Amino acid sequence: MTSRGDSREKILHTASRLFQLQGYHATGLNQIVKESGAPKGSLYHFFPNGKEELAIEAVTYTGKIVEHLIQQSMDESSDPVEAIQLFIKKTASQFDNTESIKGIPVGLLASETALISEPLRTVCMKVFKSWEAVFARKLMENGFAEEEANQLGTLINSMIEGGIMLSLTNKDKTPLLLIAEQIPVLVRKKG
């Protein structure tokens, strides 16, 4: 028998994946329950406020995973240019096999719901800012002033999000690789 925690985790994981692939409006609660294998009543037990509550938790869940992946790349090199390029190249590698593309972590849901759901817009904004902060911390550790590092963090994340959108649309990682190539121009070394 599936434990309550397992059912919640399955629902959350499945919802996160489907929102990334299909977006908010194309993902139905019945599909989430069916694909998660969780008991039907468990969705409303764990997410009594329905789809919006589930989407908010799914964005938070996905956001933490991506933040961890960014931090891993930042930890792999002391050079911020190399670390940022590494993360972008790892992200680009998802597009090596177009049949296994996982979708857009938060961008699709954010663009689809920002004007209709303030709670979803807010959680997406917080997730984006958490990713930007990882880049900014790396830059500050390497001599960048806080304001400049924060601006660059936002710019880098914006470029990556746009690169993911273009790579997904083109089924080709070239846009992300072009961004990685331009990071040295954008992030001029201090010292």
Curated annotation (Swiss-Prot):
Transcription regulation listed as a keyword: yes
DNA-binding positions: 28-47
Alphabetical list of Gene3D superfamilies matching this protein: Tetracycline Repressor, domain 2
GO MF terms held by the record: DNA binding
Key words of the record: DNA-binding, Repressor, Transcription, Transcription regulation
InterPro entries: Homeodomain-like_sf, HTH_TetR, Tet_transcr_reg_TetR-rel_C_sf, YxaF_TetR_C
Domain HTH tetR-type, chain residue ranges per copy: 5-65
PANTHER family in the cross-refs: HTH-TYPE TRANSCRIPTIONAL REGULATOR LMRA, TRANSCRIPTIONAL REGULATORY PROTEIN
Protein name: Uncharacterized HTH-type transcriptional regulator YxaF
Native source organism of the sequence: Bacillus subtilis (strain 168)
